[in-house]
Amino acid sequence: MKKLAVVAVGLMISGLVGTAQNKLKPLISSTNFTTKAQLWESIGSGILNYQADVMYIYGKLYVTPLMPDSANHKLPTLTDAYLYPLYNQFKKNNGEIVPGYPDDVYLILNLNSSAVQIYKQLALEMRPFAEMLSFKIDGNEQKGKLRILIKDKLQLEKINSVKPGFLGLVGNMSDVDKNVDSSVMPLIEVDFNEITSWKGTGNIPFEDFTKIKNLVTKVHVQSKKISIINCPSYKTIADLVQTSKIDFVTTPEATRMAGFFEIAK
């Protein structure tokens, strides 16, 4: 029975991933995955970018925003839930996480304990998967397929003050006019409520749509991508994303939102 289950999972993965590049969704899933199967299913649904809470606990990185109550916890490790399944796809597809997808996959980490300690452990845990990473350090660039980012500028400064590392930064609205190098800050994240008071019902006011279009253009001119957060999970939002050329919606309801996007032609 166990062998049959393994075969079934393998067939599901190969079938779903084989068609994923034809239906990629402009989404970043902010749900903390607990198993590698969740990530594979996400890829099969066309959701390729992820955000996860990470904590250093007794020599390993775990996917959690909070310290567990017991040493006998069942929390997933970052390697099991994200790094290994992504690398599995990378190797199986000859250096591509999804065949034909030209861009980096983003893994955004929220660091919930000492940033330097987490980074040192992450560097150790990434060693078997190092060829998959995209980064630029002191002028040396590696073009892999996975870009690991964090949001906290002070955390990144602390990490890089010890030794320049492979992490990139997610910017925010205040960074749009700073023109930070896209190799350092490839993604700008904007709170939906900062750019419109529209709640996703009816039509978005034209002046708000124009403002959003101009913002997207300004970000794209810098060779960066833009994601919106804290927006309703409605089809009207999917329509706005497609018409305004927003790159991503970051949401804990990525599976629901995926159903609102048409299959890419």
Name each model feature, range by range.
Residues 1-23:
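Bacterial Sec-dependent N-terminal signal peptides
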Residues 20-265:
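Phosphate-group recognition and catalysis centered on beta-loop-alpha active-site segments
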